């Protein structure tokens, strides 16, 4: 009798922007603005009604709690973070290889709610450097001033006429999360918008 063997391997994986890595590196300027991909980040969609047993169980399992209002992020980019998408909808982001989805499913148990692995749904691009907000302002309609958009806040907005999640992860760093099929468009737009910052300083 023939037998089937399942071999798990990460060597054949390709991230959404892997083929654009060289272009991103060439378009970046150290000390001004740098673009790179955060490949294979774990992304888990979570839904639970605030105040419910399921909501409490998920908040505890995440270790960060769940954000309570628009723009709020629980946790931080260095570990597990949870972005507010709606009153009962959240996106948890964790490092590559995290078993977060399984942990949350187990925590939810039979309580009403939803946990879905969305790791292949969006790419994660990091734009960093003092010129990063200037690049984003060329096409993002959101108010990016620090008074309105502080560190560790995230919103749904548009960039280059496509919907993205925009998360300010640090004083000079931002995560841009487009749907996977918009990754190439987003990367090329960002590289083009970064071009002026690669020009030599005019004396």
Curated annotation (Swiss-Prot):
Keyword Cytoplasm assigned: yes
Keywords linked to the UniProt accession: Cytoplasm, Oxidoreductase
Function noted in UniProt: In the presence of tetrahydrofolate, catalyzes the oxidative demethylation of sarcosine to yield glycine, 5,10-methylenetetrahydrofolate and hydrogen peroxide. In the absence of tetrahydrofolate, catalyzes the oxidative demethylation of sarcosine to yield glycine, formaldehyde and hydrogen peroxide.
NCBIfam families on file: soxG (TIGR01375)
Statement: the UniProt record of this protein carries the keyword Cytoplasm: yes
Xref: SUPFAM superfamilies: Folate-binding domain
Lineage, opening ranks: Bacteria, Bacillati, Actinomycetota, Actinomycetes, Micrococcales
GO terms classed as biological process: sarcosine catabolic process
Subunit organization: Heterotetramer composed of subunits alpha (SoxA), beta (SoxB), gamma (SoxG) and delta (SoxD).
Family statement drawn from the similarity comment of this UniProt entry: Belongs to the SoxG family.
Gene3D superfamilies tied to this protein: Heterotetrameric sarcosine oxidase, Probable tRNA modification gtpase trme, domain 1
Gene Ontology terms: cellular component: cytoplasm
Catalytic activity: sarcosine + (6S)-5,6,7,8-tetrahydrofolate + O2 = (6R)-5,10-methylene-5,6,7,8-tetrahydrofolate + glycine + H2O2; sarcosine + O2 + H2O = formaldehyde + glycine + H2O2
Its EC number(s): 1.5.3.24
Protein name (Swiss-Prot/TrEMBL): Sarcosine oxidase subunit gamma
GO MF terms held by the record: sarcosine oxidase activity
